[in-house]
């Protein structure tokens, strides 16, 4: 049969596929086992989050952010709180800032642990998830002890955090740090120099720095291609400008470089956590956890039991909510997956006029056709794993 008699065939990758990382439906056009075209179909987890936020007070809108990147929920809350605080021109007390940074770095560990171990699982390594999830369980217990919830924390508030940390939690997080670094070394021993792991990741899903910028990449995806771009250093927020940490940068822009960067970022996160713990334990770190602006923050429970005015004020804040001055603002944080941004427009009322969410995974997923072109079908799993996508924030 001549060449014209052959044609490419199309297969569905997902949404049931275990390596699709959620509800991704990828329509692949294959020439034999070589990918000619990859067409992502998204929207299977769409809940209309941005529209729902327009019908909620600022406090009621906060829990929606936990459900975007549900692997590291507090990082998303952080961006929303920063946006509101910019419009209100509201400072955050020192202790509140340190607690926020501490739990954002715990979120980074949660996200990178899940990504590294499932990326290994996607290409056939079964041991890393068993080791990684043991550590994630400990971190989720820290989340639970601080906020009362393992995943959807709803812990950050405009002006600070909801409640102070319980006794002994700081000591327990400190005691977690050193053994965790040993687990990182063990994981790296399993994967970094493993011949099969390298064959499956090196020179797969390569993207140049110029191409990464053009496609709107951020986070690990641009650092893997050679740019030392991290919002915690480039545009410091909270107390990141006081903290000492390094930005790992790759050279080749492939799946293996992105894996190595996430591995090193976990060590840097532990370094940041230790500095936060030291500062929280010092005299400087003592004090209020939330700004005492009673137009925005509710009175303490002890006050409510004694004062009728405090009770009325609490009732007003939790029913009507607080008003935010008219204006528009963009606030972004360095989430584990990249630059997570919130573009907020206020009309001066108690509900947002518009809240646009900039999800890093969305920009990364749209490059799947470019990244997987002319690769083998088996490489698609490795590429999706290295993108670190979560469909809560892609579909919103």
Curated annotation (Swiss-Prot):
Top-rank EC class of the record's enzyme: translocase
Compartments where located: Cell inner membrane
Statement: the UniProt record of this protein carries the keyword Cell inner membrane: yes
Enzyme Commission number, as recorded: 7.1.1.-
InterPro entries, sorted: NADH_Q_OxRdtase_suD, NADH_UbQ_OxRdtase_49kDa_CS, NDH1_su_D/H, NiFe-Hase_large
Catalytic activity: a quinone + NADH + 5 H(+)(in) = a quinol + NAD(+) + 4 H(+)(out)
Membrane topology: Peripheral membrane protein
GO cellular component assignments: plasma membrane
Taxonomic superkingdom: Bacteria
Keywords associated with the record: Cell inner membrane, Cell membrane, Membrane, NAD, Plasmid, Quinone, Translocase, Transport, Ubiquinone
UniProt GO MF annotations: NAD binding; NADH:ubiquinone reductase (non-electrogenic) activity; quinone binding
A Pfam family recorded for this sequence: Complex1_49kDa
Stored PANTHER family: NADH DEHYDROGENASE [UBIQUINONE] IRON-SULFUR PROTEIN 2, MITOCHONDRIAL (PTHR11993:SF10), NADH-UBIQUINONE OXIDOREDUCTASE 49 KDA SUBUNIT (PTHR11993)
Quaternary data: NDH-1 is composed of 14 different subunits. Subunits NuoB, C, D, E, F, and G constitute the peripheral sector of the complex.
Sequence similarity: Belongs to the complex I 49 kDa subunit family.
Function of the protein: NDH-1 shuttles electrons from NADH, via FMN and iron-sulfur (Fe-S) centers, to quinones in the respiratory chain. The immediate electron acceptor for the enzyme in this species is believed to be ubiquinone. Couples the redox reaction to proton translocation (for every two electrons transferred, four hydrogen ions are translocated across the cytoplasmic membrane), and thus conserves the redox energy in a proton gradient.
Protein's name according to its UniProt entry: NADH-quinone oxidoreductase subunit D 2
Species the sequence originates in: Beijerinckia indica subsp. indica (strain ATCC 9039 / DSM 1715 / NCIMB 8712)
């Amino acid at each position: 049969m001549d060449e014209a008699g052959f044609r490419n065939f199309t297969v569905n990758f997902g949404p049931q596929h275990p390596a699709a990382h959620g509800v991704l439906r990828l329509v692949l056009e294959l020439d034999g086992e070589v990918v000619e075209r990859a067409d992502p179909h998204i929207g299977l987890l769409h809940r209309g989050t941005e529209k729902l936020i327009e019908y909620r007070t600022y406090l009621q809108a906060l829990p929606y952010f936990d459900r975007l990147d549900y692997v590291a929920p507090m990082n998303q809350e952080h961006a929303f709180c920063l946006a509101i605080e910019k419009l209100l021109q509201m400072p955050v007390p020192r202790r509140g800032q340190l607690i926020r940074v501490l739990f954002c770095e715990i979120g980074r560990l949660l996200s990178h642990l899940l990504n590294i171990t499932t990326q290994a699982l996607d290409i056939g390594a079964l041991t890393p998830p068993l080791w990684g999830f043991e550590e994630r369980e400990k971190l989720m217990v820290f989340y639970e002890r601080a906020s009362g919830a393992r995943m959807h924390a709803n812990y950050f508030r405009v002006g600070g955090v909801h409640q102070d940390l319980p006794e002994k939690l700081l000591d327990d997080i400190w005691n977690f740090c050193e053994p965790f670094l040993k687990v990182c070394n063990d994981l790296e021993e399993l994967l970094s120099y493993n011949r099969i792991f390298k064959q499956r990741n090196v020179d797969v899903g390569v993207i140049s720095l110029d191409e990464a910028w053009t496609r709107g990449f951020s986070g690990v995806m641009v650092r893997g291609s050679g740019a030392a771009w991290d919002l915690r250093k480039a545009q410091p927020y909270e107390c990141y400008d006081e903290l000492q940490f390094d930005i790992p940068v790759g050279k080749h822009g492939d799946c293996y470089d992105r894996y190595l960067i996430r591995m090193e970022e976990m060590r840097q996160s532990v370094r940041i956590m230790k500095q936060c713990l030291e500062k929280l334990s010092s005299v400087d770190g003592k004090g209020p956890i939330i700004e005492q602006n009673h137009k925005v923050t509710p009175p303490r429970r002890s006050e409510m039991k004694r004062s009728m005015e405090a009770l009325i004020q609490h009732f007003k804040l939790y029913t009507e909510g607080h008003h935010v001055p008219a204006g528009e603002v963009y606030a972004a944080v360095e989430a584990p997956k990249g630059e997570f941004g919130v573009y907020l427009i206020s009309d001066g009322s108690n509900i947002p006029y518009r809240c646009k969410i900039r999800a890093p995974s969305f920009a990364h997923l749209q490059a799947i056709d470019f990244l997987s072109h002319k690769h083998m079908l088996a490489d698609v799993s490795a590429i999706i794993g290295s993108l670190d996508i979560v469909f809560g924030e892609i579909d919103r």
